Regions:
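Conserved core of the PLP fold type I
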Residues: 1-139, 150-170
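Short, charged helix-to-loop "capping" segments that act as catalytic/coupling loops
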Residues: 134-143, 172-173, 231-233
Length: 239
């Protein structure tokens, strides 16, 4: 039972990402695995047409970025189009240029808060522009926000509207996935991971995971929930 995670763990993940519990699942230890499964689901099934049946599939990758994101895309033969970071997100003019010059970009994968290694915190305006431009470009354009450092404000940091709220504002939830984990909160390779997405993308991810696993480790979920009752407990732990 509970293939999406125990209720309390889903509730915590939803609170962390400001998402709805109905659109939140709890995975294994790694959010990277959830991203891989999400890309695999689009490759095999797709929101409209499976990526495996399309040519010149590409993704926009902010640089400098996470090498595992790049390796993941390489596995699927997805072309990577780089866009520089500016200190407060991606270079929007370069982002627009990539959209204009390439016909089959399937999305962007980025770390919107404390991006490693530059430390960029994407401004609300930057995220909003990414969402609006990508949505106008294609109904298949995915916004994958790997929020690996969501609660890692060790010093005063810029405030940021939750990505879920911005995606909802721009009517882009069905194309948006937000992920985070406790890899750098509790135990590396021993924490929890969470994914939240709009209905269409969420159902696609669930479809893929249902074919691969029966359930994630619910005992580990309970272990964490006994330690973290809510988001405030997580934030207090991270001070």
């Amino acid at each position: 039972g509970h293939p999406l995670g125990i209720h309390e763990a889903r509730e915590l993940g939803a609170e962390l990402m400001s998402a709805t519990i109905e659109n939140t699942l709890v995975g294994e230890q790694s959010s990277l695995l959830l991203i891989y499964q999400l890309i695999l689901a689009n490759y095999l099934f797709g929101l409209v047409t499976p990526w495996k049946d399309q040519e010149d599939v590409a993704f926009i990758c902010p640089v400098p970025g996470f090498d595992r994101h790049f390796r993941l895309l390489e596995d699927f033969g997805i072309k990577m189009l780089t866009v520089p970071l500016t200190g407060s997100g991606v270079d929007i003019e370069k982002f627009k240029e990539l959209l204009e010059k390439n016909k089959n970009i399937k999305g962007i994968m980025c770390v919107p808060r404390h991006s490693n290694p530059s430390g960029d915190i994407y401004s609300d305006e930057n995220i909003s522009e990414i969402l609006q431009l990508g949505k106008e470009y294609s109904s298949e354009f995915l916004f994958i926000f790997d929020n690996a450092y969501l609660v890692h404000d060790f010093s005063p940091s810029k405030k940021q509207t939750p990505v879920w709220d911005l995606a909802k504002k721009h009517n882009a939830l069905d194309q948006t996935a937000i992920l985070c984990s406790f890899s750098k909160v509790t135990f590396g390779s021993g924490g929890l991971s969470f994914a939240a997405a709009g209905n269409k993308l969420f159902n696609l991810l669930v479809r893929q995971r249902t074919s691969m696993i029966v359930s994630a480790d619910k005992v580990n979920q309970l272990r964490h929930i006994e330690f973290f009752k809510n988001k405030d407990d997580v934030l207090s732990h991270m001070k």
